[in-house]
């Protein structure tokens, strides 16, 4: 391959190459019309512009070349037939890609010079379907990419760029499509892959950066980096990892920051200079050699990058890649320090009756559970074998592997004697797998076929020591086969580090003479392979060695044999990890007998055997069974035990420890020194992500119990004056949400503070009265609703009038640091602090009180003296300008830049919404109530959004240092049992009263307005709206100002059409009983149960809404189109959409009064007060459109 691009990037001066900016952003500023796209049906299909308006695309290319870009990308991001099919343009894919490449090359020729050649990258986006989630099969995706690559290649691009990758299986399909076209053409082009890491730190399907590198490392790509989703700040850690570990050139093409919704449009704040400074660091310190811009970047951004690129030298990198397997989530390195790679053996239909029975029953869920159990036992890779006579193994492998990929975090070893089955697994498993296995038993054809698919899918390979004459039984024969296979595999292009030799552990337990040497032969073969082929790995199926023995004897013999093999170089084994014993736990006599058996140390007198270790081993284990080890806890000093009680949230034995401590210390000393020290550790663990919130609350409950036990032993003065400070907290007027406020109460009160908790819906008068009574050191206001933030600001104005100046903490989901530190701080004379979470409040108080006590706090200036200089804790800067508390200031939009022109209301119906579709007939007109007796919770539980419950409500968040595998194991072992327990409790004690009112109202649209008519009127008129009918209600909806120009009214038949359409409405609640029971738990200091139940009630209300919407779809006749899994349901992959007032598509909360009036929700005890708060708290409402084009959007 001759490539001017590679010559340039690998030239001695190691230049930094600059890619262009955002194609979409810079097409939008041209204000293209539907006609420019070739008609309304193609509007939004940027790829079609190379045919309908090529000058628009050429303008973008020229602007970026003029700015100094070295490379522009073709306008083919969505250029596969699969994506173009959404516009009925699938058959144009080859032509559009070729035309786009030729267009970009023509513009490049206008700018290219010998000193600064210009290049064109063929852009290949991710498409709209993720193969790992089953949206599209691997072969279809690969075939679609083949068409695109042919067009780009024939159009003359200089390199191919697979970009914005969200799914590693999608990347493999693209890369293998590219390789197919290269084989057709007899030549290659440079390859670049750019993955997209979302704000949560992984790709969309959950892949970590290390896993992405492990998966892509086997492929012949030239550049690997990141683009899209975030700005450069959130890319830093990923780029750093690539810098240190990737063998490829590193690229970084960020957005201009994170997008924000400003006036209904995506707005990117990062300025050209800010982008320039960030990428300058990446070049000089991390060795990045390819830079550019993604969403929101304009020519001025690219000019800023080009200005620095010509003068900067990338840091010389010395990357070290550790050979690894990977799931779609995380990596597993092959090398294990002082141990071996554990490959779980129980998911094997050839060797496990349990697995075979489950496979025959096609009980896929139980097979997945069997896999998960091996994760708990310590397996690091899962061996997956579905070989069973009479079954369709290709289908079985696809079915099982596709489930394992999304449910188990370990890499897979696909195990079969037939390569077709292994490939079936590779087509659904996007991680880096290992193939088990190939050998020469059927000659070289099958041997090379397995190598071929290993190379194609980037997999490791197990090679058994078997040739055309059968299994190698002697050490010499085993090594001879290994050496032959090694030379062939290396010549084929398989790296030595990806080869696992299996020298075959054959039974030594049969008593057959020719089997006596099997153990020694295997050990000797391992030693020789390790010495002469040192870069390869050596794997064994250990349990074969003990075939036929008593289970207890097998466990010991397997453990001793494993140890012997490790000593001479074995580094991987297929075993049940929980069935291997450490040598220290094996009786010395048993050890010796096993060694004698492995090395065939029988003793003879003449021909008579006087000592047979096999016989001895059988005798030693006669009647014995396997036993599990139970270890006791160490005895700790009472001081340390008290601390551990708090940290572990363990109340068992607490009173005994406290009684012991009372003999040595005063009660206050026990609290202030040892118990609070434990709570301090809890706070540190929570802050570093090592402890989840529910466990923090367990610690708080234990702390509360300890203090309650000690109080009778205290003097009255001690009990009254012990508080570190006083903290006043309230949820503001009109807001019933108290979970966040109560968590602050729990954390502060159990860290030595006196907390005055006023409760929910507190008007400012109550807060002021409480202030005057308790004289708190700090006031905190909480609220979940957007409207609550306005009340907070109003309250601050009243505080000023009342002369209140103490620091005020504001907390709640609707708040942002910018609103607190700009709007609210400018309102209040004292200091305003953004309360990110309960521990942020605690940290502030822990600094405030000693500062006040040492006269280093001023209500107007904030911290003074030494306290004002501690990093992250300043409330004011040195010059007195107000800033935040430990949070980096946000960039603000210059108001003068915003448009001041009067708004013209657009009421023209969107052409993106098809008006000609069959309108359903509802089963009834009007409303219907479903009481608790009509609703089975067993039908609602499966619709729980577990991500929202576990992470959002219960706050079981994955710590950054925890692997995906460890996190999933934690959820399986700790969190799912909690959910199961609460499901049972809710059912047994009738703690939720699910109630629904829903209905169907006749409607028609008129511009941006939806007209609602009397259901009785339509019922009396044969289901039709009379022409002279008067609407009983109207809803006015906003319209998008650009793009598809959607408005909710567009989804319904127009008044002009005369068609009667259907407007479904719903309101659901789990009842006031949920609110009352949550209050009871909190009042009883049952903090953890309070968190669990409150969170579950909130999410059950959401699940009930999903259940009701599902019922409506079924009643309207298209429920059969629903997906068959909860994930797709929650991602709105059904027909139509559900909207709630207050959100961008229908923002007017006043309309909810009308909705509740139509549904007459007071009949189920659901209402909304004057502050627009719905009661009971755990309730939701929604309006529904059944139109296929209806999805969430911002207007």
From Swiss-Prot:
Domain (Pterin-binding) spans 340-599
Q: Which cofactor does it need?
A: methylcob(III)alamin; Zn(2+)
Positions of the B12-binding N-terminal domain: 629-722
Mind listing the GO biological process terms from this record?
homocysteine metabolic process; methionine biosynthetic process; methylation; tetrahydrofolate metabolic process
Identify the GO cellular component terms for this protein: cytosol
Coiled coil where? none
Record-annotated Hcy-binding domain positions = 1-309
Q: B12-binding domain location, by residue?
A: 724-859
Output one GO MF annotation.
zinc ion binding
Q: Which UniProt keywords apply?
A: Amino-acid biosynthesis, Cobalamin, Cobalt, Metal-binding, Methionine biosynthesis, Methyltransferase, Repeat, S-adenosyl-L-methionine, Transferase, Zinc
**Pathway(s) it belongs to:** Amino-acid biosynthesis; L-methionine biosynthesis via de novo pathway; L-methionine from L-homocysteine (MetH route): step 1/1
Q: InterPro entries annotated for this entry?
A: Cbl-bd_cap, Cobalamin-bd, Cobalamin-bd_sf, Dihydropteroate_synth-like_sf, HCY_dom, HCY_dom_sf, Met_Synthase/Corrinoid, Met_synthase_B12-bd
Which reaction does this chain catalyze?
A: (6S)-5-methyl-5,6,7,8-tetrahydrofolate + L-homocysteine = (6S)-5,6,7,8-tetrahydrofolate + L-methionine
Q: What domain of life?
A: Bacteria
Q: Which residues bind methylcob(III)alamin?
A: 734-738, 782, 838
Question: Which residues are noted in the entry as S-adenosyl-L-methionine-binding?
Answer: 945, 1138, 1192-1193
Any idea where the AdoMet activation domain is?
Answer: 896-1195
Report residues binding Zn(2+): 228, 294-295
So what EC number does this one have? 2.1.1.13
Q: How is the cofactor bound?
A: Binds 1 zinc ion per subunit.
Q: Which SUPFAM superfamilies match?
A: Cobalamin (vitamin B12)-binding domain (SSF52242), Dihydropteroate synthetase-like (SSF51717), Homocysteine S-methyltransferase (SSF82282), Methionine synthase activation domain-like (SSF56507), Methionine synthase domain (SSF47644)
Domain comment from the record reads as follows: Modular enzyme with four functionally distinct domains. The isolated Hcy-binding domain catalyzes methyl transfer from free methylcobalamin to homocysteine. The Hcy-binding domain in association with the pterin-binding domain catalyzes the methylation of cob(I)alamin by methyltetrahydrofolate and the methylation of homocysteine. The B12-binding domain binds the cofactor. The AdoMet activation domain binds S-adenosyl-L-methionine. Under aerobic conditions cob(I)alamin can be converted to inactive cob(II)alamin.
Q: Which family does it belong to?
A: Belongs to the vitamin-B12 dependent methionine synthase family.
Other observations noted? L-homocysteine is bound via the zinc atom.
The protein's role, per its UniProt record: Catalyzes the transfer of a methyl group from methyl-cobalamin to homocysteine, yielding enzyme-bound cob(I)alamin and methionine. Subsequently, remethylates the cofactor using methyltetrahydrofolate.
Q: What is this protein called?
A: Methionine synthase
